[in-house]
Regions:
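C-terminal substrate-binding/active-site "lid" region of AdoMet-derived donor-dependent transferases
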Residues: 169-203, 215
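Class I SAM-dependent transferase core
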Residues: 4-69, 116, 120
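Conserved SAM/SAH cofactor-binding pocket of Class I
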Residues: 60-151, 157
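Helix-to-beta-strand junctions that scaffold the AdoMet/dcAdoMet cofactor pocket
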Residues: 164-165
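A structural micro-motif
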Residues: 16, 95, 120-122, 168, ...
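Single conserved hydrophobic/aromatic residue that forms the stacking wall/gate
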Residues: 220-229
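Short hydrophobic/aromatic beta-strand or adjacent loop that forms the aromatic wall/cage
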Residues: 209-213
């Protein structure tokens, strides 16, 4: 798996800009994922090549698509098995990463994996996005918020934009067949203070797959009620 990831990072032009042990850590993460997947439903992908390409390199492909240079904090909403938040942490260790998931057992596993990989500045927490958005310590707090196809873009924007700082960005990983979603989400994004800054389609190295990254900038804090508890 390490060789597939390493060659994929090279194909993406990332070899010199990510830590030298990034491929090794991503491969170890993939190994731990497949091992745990035998007793916990974490991914439908059950082979090393699929995990390398459709999980690790899919997330790594975000780096050429978006500017991460000024970002210091990242929240991954509906992280599941940790995508894309944990690979981004491995590739960009300067990021302070929070992984949000609704299931305690996944959260516990993600914290265990982070420790096994020797990562610091990353935590997994349990909760639902619509509830955590009411928490003063999390609302309007992150430079970047990510989500990987956990819902349609309109709903994702409503769930994710409340966490973004003004001037920050929401990065939504979608399929290339999401044009209708984009159209349907436009009004909600505007009401929430956002604007679609860019839509980038990208190929995953070694896979005959193209995915899409929708980049939404937050221009001002949403006027809709988001009172803290």
């Amino acid at each position: 798996m390490k060789e597939l990831i390493s060659s994929g990072l090279e194909a993406l032009g990332l070899t010199g800009s990510v830590p030298p042990d990034a491929a090794e850590k991503l491969a170890e993460y993939g190994r731990l994922l497949l091992e745990k997947n035998q007793v916990m439903n974490l991914t439908a992908i059950r082979d090393e090549a699929g995990v390398a390409r459709l999980h690790m390199l899919d997330c790594a492909a975000l780096l050429p698509c978006a500017d991460f240079s000024q970002a210091r904090t990242l929240l991954d909403v509906g992280t599941g098995a940790g995508f894309p938040g944990l690979p981004l942490k491995i590739l960009l260790p300067q990021l302070d990463v929070t992984l949000l998931d609704s299931l305690n057992k996944r959260v516990d596993w993600l914290n265990e994996v982070s420790a096994q990989l020797g990562l610091t500045g990353v935590r997994a927490i349990q909760g639902r996005a619509e509830e955590k958005a009411l928490d003063k310590s999390m609302r309007d707090s992150f430079d970047l918020v990510t989500a990987r196809a956990v819902a349609d873009l309109r709903l994702l924007s409503e769930l994710c934009l409340p966490f973004v700082k003004v001037g920050g960005r929401f990065l939504s990983m979608k399929s290339v067949d999401s044009d209708q979603e984009l159209d349907q989400a436009a009004h909600a994004i505007k009401l929430l203070g956002g604007r679609v800054r860019d839509v980038k389609d990208y190929a995953i190295p070694g896979a005959d797959v193209t995915h899409r990254l929708v980049i939404v900038c937050l221009l001002y804090t949403s006027p809709s009620p988001r009172d803290t508890r």
